[in-house]
């Protein structure tokens, strides 16, 4: 892995997609101005609706992923244009895409290169379900789970990717080995985030001896839902290099090849695996 600068964007997305697109572009531009080579957006950046079903009306067909695409898809076009205009690799959080099942969308992470062409995607596999403490979430009611474990590489760097609830399943990331950087857009609830977010992120970094970039939703949304925030960049030893507790903003950190190799050489746990 070559050394590079990564950024995590944190948002408090609203019910208005156009406002969210403007905010996304402004924050990615800010990250680029801070020297970021890669920028990761949070889950659900285009829309945090008042109801889980709101995203169905905004689901897009998957376009051909090219800058000169013939069909206009609002969210995908915004991501492509922003990557090209800012000269960054843009990991596009998640956007709602049309699925084969009526009443459900795919919750999809799209990756764009510096020319604005799509170079990867991943449909979220593990769907969040939680009830208790006056809260209930059931993503499976409105989202169709993906079937394919991601295999991504950008700038000749092998990557792992997951979305939010995927973080709780270590075998999901083991299935993506080998990789040097793990990217995770999320919208953790305040309840689960306060209890487990940092613990899980640092654990994934340590057990995979990799950098972790995690972008979150972070604040109170119009639905009354409160997301935990605390976007983080973590090194392969589990040290937190940067974090943003709440509110919109950008954090940056350098992903250093020497640091990665040092950790893996001094404690070659990945080579010692028996299972």
Where does each model-flagged region fall?
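Extreme N-terminal starter segment of soluble prokaryotic enzymes
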Residues: 1-7
